[in-house]
């Protein structure tokens, strides 16, 4: 029998429909894989009993011909999504053993469609990080290794657990969130596909907030088709989220394999950075050639304010975070460290509960929002954000269907290798991805090649607002040309 954990989500769906195996068998195979791969530290909470119950219920639905679009398909959930009665911590000590009394909208929709919960996935604390090294549960280890080396590599972040679990066959797909690249960068580092939908496409209700005007949920999966299937279930209007957009959710899967003939693909000259590795440059050109061969037209475009995106992002995001994280004070939920009075209790709780990177961003955010600096920093960053958005609008107004860029400036790096003395070194990982969040656009990362050491590299496609369909069509062209990327199993 085929190894059930090596199937794509679409293949598993077809296998269940054909009665080749049951949802319980599929779930058990994934639970065994999770157990054998604990060294990767991808899961921070395993829910085997609940998984088997949900799988059993899915089998009953499938037998009656009433299974939903995701019936019996086992998924991992990033620990930023509230799961009713199951520990949700955002991988921070300050939330302790918090068990929500409610379910996030995105996960509610996944369970409505019959999906199975395998457990909660590791992430950077409060989604603040690009390497999954800031989690209070410890770092996630990338299932990929450099050729001839057993050095531990990061899976990217903040959705490192989601990307590692999908790459290692520990779930058929995973939920993730993206504030400045947290879906696309880990997908690129692990040879998986990750899409950040348009801002407002997926509800943020029940997701632990980092930066509310930038956060967006999306899937990480093994293929473009799988990510399209998952996004259809995750997306939709939610009156509980005031930023949720009320427009119909298309059948994204129908766009996979769609013709790209005649589409104009923008190649932004500002993304050609000084010191960009030759491998990334070559991959980018190769991706453009693949799209051209499929009938797309390549045009050079200009996004002149790109160079200001990263500094503006690292003002806006920490400012919103400092406001959002003010709610963690030890009073009503989460961990508490007592003091002689309430102020001291707040201080002690936050000092003990937040990790170093979260404290750094809260302090940056509080600083840029303070009376003397608000105009100079925060207001100016918001004006820059408007200019970045306008750059993209002008580009799309010229008939460009999508923009092709690298997803990351490098392949996965070693654990402990970056950001020790200089956090900016780590922040530079987001250089190709933050513009998309600042403009609220959809962006997909698709694995497109390998570096000289055999590590996967990804390309990014940026689309018009609510035109995820085009990204799925173009992404599939790259996927077909580049092939699949699967790490050699060293952990079991």
From Swiss-Prot:
Task: Identify the catalytic residues.
Answer: 78, 158, 182
Output the Gene Ontology terms for molecular function.
Answer: ATP binding; glutaminyl-tRNA synthase (glutamine-hydrolyzing) activity
Gene Ontology cellular-component terms listed: glutamyl-tRNA(Gln) amidotransferase complex
Per the UniProt record, which EC number(s) apply here?
Answer: 6.3.5.7
Kindly give the SUPFAM superfamilies that the UniProt entry links to this protein. Amidase signature (AS) enzymes
Q: Which domain of life is it from?
A: Bacteria
InterPro entries per UniProt? Amidase (IPR000120), Amidase_CS (IPR020556), Amidase_dom (IPR023631), AS_sf (IPR036928), GatA (IPR004412)
Signal peptide, first to last residue: none
Which terms are listed as keywords in the entry? Answer: ATP-binding, Ligase, Nucleotide-binding, Protein biosynthesis
Recorded catalytic reaction(s): these are: L-glutamyl-tRNA(Gln) + L-glutamine + ATP + H2O = L-glutaminyl-tRNA(Gln) + L-glutamate + ADP + phosphate + H(+)
The yes or no answer to whether the keyword Kinase is present is no
The GO annotation for biological process reads: translation
What Gene3D superfamilies does UniProt report for this protein, alphabetically?
Amidase signature (AS) domain
A Pfam family matched in the record: Amidase
Assembly and interaction partners:
Heterotrimer of A, B and C subunits.
Q: Which HAMAP family match?
A: GatA
Family classification:
Belongs to the amidase family. GatA subfamily.
User: What is the annotated role of this protein in its UniProt record?
Assistant: Allows the formation of correctly charged Gln-tRNA(Gln) through the transamidation of misacylated Glu-tRNA(Gln) in organisms which lack glutaminyl-tRNA synthetase. The reaction takes place in the presence of glutamine and ATP through an activated gamma-phospho-Glu-tRNA(Gln).
Name this polypeptide is given: Glutamyl-tRNA(Gln) amidotransferase subunit A
């Amino acid at each position: 029998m085929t190894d059930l954990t090596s199937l794509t989500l679409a293949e598993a769906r077809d296998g269940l429909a054909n009665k080749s195996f049951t949802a319980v068998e599929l779930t058990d195979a994934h639970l065994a894989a999770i157990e054998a791969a604990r060294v990767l530290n991808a899961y921070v909470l395993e829910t085997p009993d609940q998984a088997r119950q949900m799988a059993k219920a899915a089998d009953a639905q499938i037998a009656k011909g009433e299974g939903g679009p995701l019936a019996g398909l086992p998924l991992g959930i990033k620990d930023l999504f509230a799961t009713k009665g199951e520990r949700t911590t955002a991988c921070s000590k300050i939330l302790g053993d918090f068990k929500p009394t409610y379910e996030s909208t995105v996960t509610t929709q996944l369970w409505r469609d019959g999906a199975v919960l395998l457990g909660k996935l590791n992430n950077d604390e409060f989604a603040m990080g690009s390497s999954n090294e800031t989690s209070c549960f410890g770092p996630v280890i990338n299932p990929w290794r450099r050729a001839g080396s057993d050095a531990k590599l990061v899976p990217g972040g903040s959705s490192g657990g989601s990307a590692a679990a999908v790459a290692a066959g520990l779930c058929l797909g995973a939920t993730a969130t993206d504030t400045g690249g947290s879906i696309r960068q880990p997908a690129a580092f692990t040879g998986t596909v990750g899409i950040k939908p348009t801002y407002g496409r997926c509800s943020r209700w029940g997701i632990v907030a980092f930066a509310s005007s930038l956060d967006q949920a999306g899937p990480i999966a093994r293929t473009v088709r799988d990510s399209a299937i998952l996004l259809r279930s995750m997306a939709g209007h939610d009156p509980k989220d005031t930023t949720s957009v009320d427009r119909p959710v298309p059948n994204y899967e129908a766009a996979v394999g769609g013709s790209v003939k005649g589409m104009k693909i923008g190649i932004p000259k500002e993304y050609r950075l000084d010191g960009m590795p030759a491998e990334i440059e070559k991959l980018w050109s190769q991706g453009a050639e693949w799209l051209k061969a499929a009938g797309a037209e390549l045009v050079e475009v200009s996004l002149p304010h790109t160079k200001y995106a990263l500094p503006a992002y690292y003002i806006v995001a920490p400012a919103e975070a400092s406001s959002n994280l003010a709610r963690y004070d030890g009073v009503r939920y989460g961990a508490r460290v007592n003091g002689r009075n309430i102020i001291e209790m707040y201080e002690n709780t936050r000092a003990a509960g937040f990790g170093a990177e979260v404290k750094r961003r809260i302090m940056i955010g509080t600083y840029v929002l303070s009376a003397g600096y608000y105009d100079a920093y925060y207001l100016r960053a918001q004006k820059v954000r408007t200019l970045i958005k306008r750059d993209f609008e002008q580009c799309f107004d010229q008939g460009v269907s999508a923009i092709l860029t690298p997803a990351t400036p490098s392949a996965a790096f070693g654990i402990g290798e970056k950001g020790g003395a200089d956090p900016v070194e780590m922040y530079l990982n987001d250089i190709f991805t933050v513009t998309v969040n600042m403009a609220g656009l959809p962006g997909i990362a698709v694995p497109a090649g390998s570096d000289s050491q055999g590590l996967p590299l990804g390309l990014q496609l940026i689309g018009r607002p609510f035109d995820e369909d085009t990204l799925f069509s173009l992404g599939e062209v790259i996927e077909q040309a580049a092939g699949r990327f699967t790490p050699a199993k060293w952990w079991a």
